[in-house]
């Protein structure tokens, strides 16, 4: 079933002009630490290469795709539509049946912004999900600036802000409610509590 779902998504994206990109499974730690400081470094699976440099098993797909786009696709006609279907690796505390290896399928629309770009990627996501045969799905939109603005409005200290971010990311809604309780009925607390 997993392979059929993956193939259905691939077909839908390719029909919309998205090309597959495959990135290295092992990258230098610095690629992720500098480009995406929001990634939890404690969850990265670290490897030391023979020259002593710290490498990681790919914890995310967007960061290496952005690196490749910036270094190897700089003369490509814009916009560039890419999709990936590859595993990411993260250290999972307590295991709980998870082995730290997750298939991640997604798409990147590079070189344009605004409403037309948003429409393109959202219609591709809708088509891909529809193709899988699932008829009851929800598309969640995330933008780091929304979260940052709400945290600033909330007046949370750095430790509280990081804790709230992780709870939202992990969809730990009961714990999120507890973490937001000290902020009372502030509109920013209500908005953060309603984030998907």
What are these regions (language model features)?
Residues 1-63, 67-196:
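Extended, charged alpha-beta segments that form solvent-exposed binding/catalytic grooves
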């Amino acid at each position: 079933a997993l392979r059929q779902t993956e193939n259905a998504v691939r077909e839908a994206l390719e029909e919309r002009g998205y090309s597959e990109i495959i990135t290295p499974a092992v990258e230098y730690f610095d690629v992720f630490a500098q480009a995406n400081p929001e990634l939890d470094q404690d969850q990265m699976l670290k490897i030391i290469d023979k020259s002593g440099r710290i490498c990681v098993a790919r914890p995310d797909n967007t960061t290496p795709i952005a690196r490749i786009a910036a270094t190897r696709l700089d003369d490509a006609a814009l916009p560039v539509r890419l999709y990936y279907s590859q595993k990411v690796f993260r250290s999972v505390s307590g295991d709980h049946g998870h082995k730290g290896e997750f298939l991640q399928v997604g798409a990147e629309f590079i070189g344009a912004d605004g409403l037309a770009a948003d429409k393109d990627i959202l219609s591709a996501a809708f088509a891909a999900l529809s193709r899988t045969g699932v008829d009851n799905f929800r598309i969640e939109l995330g933008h780091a600036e929304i979260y940052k603005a709400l945290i600033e409005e909330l007046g949370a200290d750095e430790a509280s802000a990081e804790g709230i971010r992780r709870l939202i990311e992990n969809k730990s809604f009961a714990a999120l409610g507890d973490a937001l309780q000290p902020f009372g009925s502030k509109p920013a607390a209500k908005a953060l509590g309603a984030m998907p």
